[in-house]
């Protein structure tokens, strides 16, 4: 096989007159009046190859037998296309290759779908034939971008003096967080390793070890319910550093992300990134990861409506809840009564018991609850919401968390439906000053908002075991276009604080020692102040590539039900394998 001289997509007018050897796949073959044209594709693009009997009759005869997705080697000369033959849709559209020789390296069955962008095919079929799906130029380009993003992160961290250190994939299962993927031990029957949800504890131990600056591009595993921006296995840009403030860690993160966006998209992002406290994010946007590319902010109108004779509002306020509203500017005409009923059904998915609404027409409030607003109250409400003719006012009344969840989700939905979002914009945001704990209704107790190793604010440490709800954390999340792309914090580095943290989470001293004794021991040997952040590589690439599902950024992903249609994983194993591991499967009885 002759050595390749160029990639197909690299050929241009500078190559005219040059002899080239190309390897690739046949994208398309056309037979036109004794001439055969082949579009040859490789990872860099497509070029047109012409087979002319006057130039090589033998090559023409072989080309006649070629079909789509055959793998071939072509030797020929680069020529300029005629003016009328120029194809502006191709990067190589001003040139073509006049073939002298063609060698068929392998044939191909007819693929189950066309290998081209925009093909209408189910996700299940794409994943079953993922190796064909990845041939499509748009998929190829995503993985070029992923390579660029990964390389840029690595180069930046190397330049900043971070050590790339690997941590083990076979670790110990620990509570808190999502479910672990467990790996049975053959040597110790009945015992299990866990695949890491993150290298959190181990990277902290590397700080105890004195490495000062660590990073790793690491695969993580979480057995959790899936959605478009989650996968059971995913990749993090993970870093940890000693003796730095959280502001310094944030500055490093910003520098990396600015470089990544410049390299991947050739877009310049201003820094420092805007900052917002967790409380402000929840109050204004109903989300701890707000998309700040558009408005539709939530406005608390409890004080305005507390005296109106509408029982839904009154009841919510009397029971310690609140009433908030969104003003969808100039959107009243966009929504019929049926549309508004559908929005009510939508917010019910987030716990809301309903969605009240008003429209502003000719200076007056119109709608089912307009009768509860006398002129003075109507004027006050319009002023508080800056409402004008044509505006649509949407209200939720309930406990604060339900109001935030329902109106926050509604805000995102309306942002898309009303075309308020500039899809080309990249809006980074730091969300800071998080509560250390959040209340888990199902468990009936407080759990870590991030993880049990997050450092409380110094002034709140005395409250850890007495008033958990008031403790604030030295934590920070980085958000991009409404997606959390990273989370970080300063870490607990003193044993007595970590012990207090575990007690606040409901651990006995004995259970904490059993689960985390190795960490507690390390904290007695001069662990330095340290902190870090983990950035979601797959999610960053998804956003930069303009996709809406993580599957498109992972070479061999799982479906929404955590199945791999390509390999049919997960699958059963043999009785012999189970016996070797001292395991039995429990069969469900059927009637």
UniProtKB/Swiss-Prot annotation:
GO cellular component labels: cytoplasm
Residue ranges, annotated region (Aspartate): 200-203
Catalytic activity: tRNA(Asp) + L-aspartate + ATP = L-aspartyl-tRNA(Asp) + AMP + diphosphate
Top-level taxon of origin: Bacteria
Alphabetical keyword list: Aminoacyl-tRNA synthetase, ATP-binding, Cytoplasm, Ligase, Nucleotide-binding, Protein biosynthesis
BP GO terms, sorted: aspartyl-tRNA aminoacylation
Gene3D superfamilies linked to this entry: Bira Bifunctional Protein, Domain 2, GAD-like domain, Nucleic acid-binding proteins
Main location class: cytoplasm
Location within or outside the cell: Cytoplasm
Residues binding ATP, per UniProt: 222-224, 231, 484, 536-539
Pfam families noted in UniProt: GAD (PF02938), tRNA-synt_2 (PF00152), tRNA_anti-codon (PF01336)
PANTHER family: ASPARTATE--TRNA LIGASE, MITOCHONDRIAL, ASPARTYL/LYSYL-TRNA SYNTHETASE
Record's function text: Catalyzes the attachment of L-aspartate to tRNA(Asp) in a two-step reaction: L-aspartate is first activated by ATP to form Asp-AMP and then transferred to the acceptor end of tRNA(Asp).
Family: Belongs to the class-II aminoacyl-tRNA synthetase family. Type 1 subfamily.
Protein name per Swiss-Prot or TrEMBL: Aspartate--tRNA ligase
Biological source species: Listeria monocytogenes serotype 4b (strain F2365)
Organism phylogeny: Bacteria, Bacillati, Bacillota, Bacilli, Bacillales
């Amino acid at each position: 096989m002759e050595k390749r001289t160029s990639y197909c997509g690299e050929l241009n007018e500078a190559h005219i007159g040059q002899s080239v050897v190309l390897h690739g796949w046949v994208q398309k073959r056309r037979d036109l009046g004794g001439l055969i044209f082949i579009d040859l594709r490789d990872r860099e693009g497509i070029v047109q190859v012409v087979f002319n009997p006057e130039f090589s009759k033998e090559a023409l005869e072989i080309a006649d037998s070629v079909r789509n997705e055959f793998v071939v080697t072509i030797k020929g000369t680069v020529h300029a296309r005629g003016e009328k033959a120029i194809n502006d849709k191709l990067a190589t559209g001003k040139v073509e290759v006049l073939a002298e020789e063609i060698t068929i390296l392998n044939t191909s069955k007819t693929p189950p779908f066309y290998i081209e962008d925009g093909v209408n095919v189910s996700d299940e079929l794409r994943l079953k034939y993922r190796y064909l799906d990845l041939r499509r130029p748009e998929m190829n380009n995503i993985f070029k971008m992923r390579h660029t993003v990964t390389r840029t992160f690595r180069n930046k961290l190397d330049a900043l003096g971070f050590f790339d250190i690997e941590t083990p994939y076979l670790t110990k299962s620990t509570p808190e967080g999502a479910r672990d993927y467990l790996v049975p031990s053959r040597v110790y029957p009945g015992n299990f390793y866990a695949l890491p949800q993150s290298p959190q504890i181990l990277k902290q131990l590397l700080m105890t070890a004195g490495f000062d600056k660590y990073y790793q591009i690491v695969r993580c595993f979480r057995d959790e319910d899936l959605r478009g921006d989650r996968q059971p296995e995913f990749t993090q840009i993970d870093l940890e550093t000693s003796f730095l403030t959280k502001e310094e860690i944030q500055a490093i993160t910003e520098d990396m992300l600015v470089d990544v966006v410049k390299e991947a998209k050739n877009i310049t992002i201003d820094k420092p990134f805007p900052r917002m406290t967790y409380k402000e994010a929840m109050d204004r946007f109903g989300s701890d990861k707000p998309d700040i590319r558009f408005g539709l902010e939530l406005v608390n109108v409890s004080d305005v409506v507390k005296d109106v004779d509408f029982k839904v509002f009154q009841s919510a306020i009397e029971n310690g809840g609140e009433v908030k509203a969104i003003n969808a500017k100039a959107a009243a005409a966009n929504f019929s009564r049926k549309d508004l009923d559908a929005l009510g059904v939508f917010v019910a998915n987030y716990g809301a018991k309903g969605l009240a609404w008003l429209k502003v027409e000719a200076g007056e409030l119109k709608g089912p609850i307009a009768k509860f607003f006398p002129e003075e109250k109507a004027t006050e409400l319009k002023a508080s919401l800056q409402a004008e003719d044509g505006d649509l006012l949407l209200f939720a009344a309930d406990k604060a968390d339900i109001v935030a969840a329902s109106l926050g989700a509604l805000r995102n939905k309306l942002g898309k439906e009303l075309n308020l979002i500039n899809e080309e914009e990249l809006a980074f945001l730091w969300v800071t000053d998080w509560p250390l704990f959040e209340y888990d209704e199902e468990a009936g107790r407080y759990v870590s908002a991030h993880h049990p190793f997050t450092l409380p604010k110094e002034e709140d440490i005395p409250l850890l075991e007495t008033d958990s709800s008031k403790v604030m954390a030295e934590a920070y999340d980085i958000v991009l276009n409404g997606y959390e792309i990273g989370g970080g914090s300063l870490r607990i580095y003193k044993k007595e604080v970590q012990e207090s943290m575990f007690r606040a989470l409901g651990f006995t001293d004995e259970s904490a020692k059993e689960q985390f004794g190795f960490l507690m021991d390390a904290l007695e040997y001069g662990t330095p102040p340290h902190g870090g952040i983990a950035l979601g590589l797959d999610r960053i690439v998804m956003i930069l590539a303009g996709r809406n599902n993580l599957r498109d950024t992972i070479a061999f992903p799982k479906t929404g039900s955590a199945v791999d249609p390509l390999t049919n994983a997960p699958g059963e194993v043999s009785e012999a394998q189970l016996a070797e591991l001292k395991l039995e499967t429990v069969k469900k009885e059927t009637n």
